[in-house]
UniProtKB/Swiss-Prot annotation:
UniProt name for this protein: Putative ADP-ribosyl glycohydrolase L543
EC number in record: 3.2.2.-
Protein keywords: Hydrolase
Chain segments annotated as transmembrane: none
Lipid metabolism among keywords: no
InterPro entries for this protein: ADP-ribosylglycohydrolase, Ribosyl_crysJ1, Ribosyl_crysJ1_sf
A Pfam family reported for this protein in Swiss-Prot or TrEMBL: ADP_ribosyl_GH
Enzyme class, broadest EC rank: hydrolase
GO molecular function term, any single one: hydrolase activity
């Protein structure tokens, strides 16, 4: 096994966690407020500070990262993605009194069985295109870093992603959307550069007929400050709007970052400066940039996550403790 692949997988996970934790400080802010806070906190040069709307500890992460840990725990123990065991872990998380939970997630994970989660997703979440479904994939894709690249491996990862997505999202577009992101992440972990990952994503978007991705690729390639999807035009200055959880914004920021940045820190700071769903947006791009630019994640940010002391939360959800989940890292 190539040690660099293992390093990229490890830093994809850490990059996601750092992005989530950093972004949580600015969650739900407007663009101007986010920019002012970044300057006030000296762009987190001394480490992550927590706080935010939920009063988090420095280095503490949010709900979807905790959910990603549920996936990691199953893959670590069994070596593969087991939908039934993951569903059990998801429900355990739901019962842990999380400090935040989105409506889409609550609708499904409040059910106590895999089949009931899928039924609830079909009943209540058909219209949801929320971004947490992509965010938690950093707990899945990097865990298979040591699989030999092949069409069989691609199908294996695609199946796992699809099985995970349907636990919370039943919109038929969300499966391909998640698969495209997941395969881009795996591609980066295997050592492909940002340009190749960007082009690979576009090929996947064409292959799986993802109108959302194709529209966003057109926007990024043309350097527009908007993209069109389902007869609606989305503008860059709407990222902090009431529709901030739309997965399209997360994908847009990710693809813009791939074209613009070659450094983890700069990409994450710019994403957060837009305000809105800063934790999720930074996490989704953070995983990809952690794999691509693994040596550019500020060590002080990684240390903040690895040394987090959210002891009260660990009592209800023990696997959020770095002493536990750090043992599962590649």
């Amino acid at each position: 096994m190539n040690n660099m692949i293992e390093l990229r997988a490890r830093n994809a996970i850490l990059g996601a966690m750092v992005g989530d934790s950093l972004g949580s400080t600015f969650e739900f802010t407007k663009q101007k407020q986010a920019a002012n806070k970044l300057a006030q906190y000296n762009y987190l040069s001394d480490g992550l500070i927590g706080k935010g709307p939920f009063g988090l500890k420095p280095g503490q992460f949010t709900d979807d990262t905790e959910i990603a840990l549920a996936i990691m725990s199953v893959i670590h123990e069994y070596g593969y993605y087991d939908q039934y065991r993951v569903a059990e872990k998801y429900h355990e998380w739901y019962n842990s009194n999380p400090f935040d939970i989105g409506n889409t997630t609550k609708n499904s994970l409040s059910q106590n069985s895999c089949s009931d989660m899928i039924k609830a997703s079909r009943k209540y979440n058909f219209g949801s295109m929320s971004n947490g479904s992509l965010m938690r994939l950093f707990g899945l894709v990097p865990m298979f870093y040591d699989r030999v690249p092949s069409s069989r491996t691609t199908k294996f990862i695609m199946k796992a992603i699809q099985q995970d997505i349907i636990l919370t999202h039943s919109n038929p577009e969300m499966g391909p959307i998640a698969i495209i992101y997941g395969l881009m992440l795996w591609h980066a972990i295997q050592g492909h550069n940002a340009s190749n990952v960007y082009k690979y994503g576009k090929l996947l978007a064409e292959k799986y007929h993802s109108d959302l991705y194709l529209s966003i690729y057109l926007s990024v390639d043309s350097e527009y400050d908007f993209f069109d999807y389902n007869d609606t035009r989305y503008h860059l200055n709407q990222i902090d709007s009431s529709n901030f959880g739309f997965v399209g914004f997360s994908i847009w920021l990710m693809l813009r970052s791939l074209k613009k940045h070659s450094d983890y820190r700069n990409a994450i700071i710019e994403i957060v400066s837009h305000g809105g769903d800063t934790d999720t947006n930074a996490c989704i791009t953070g995983a990809l940039f952690g794999a691509l630019y693994y040596n550019t994640i500020p060590s002080v940010w990684i240390d903040s996550v690895l040394n987090c002391q959210a002891t009260e939360r660990y009592q209800n959800y023990p696997i959020a403790n770095p002493k536990i989940w750090s043992q599962w890292l590649p």
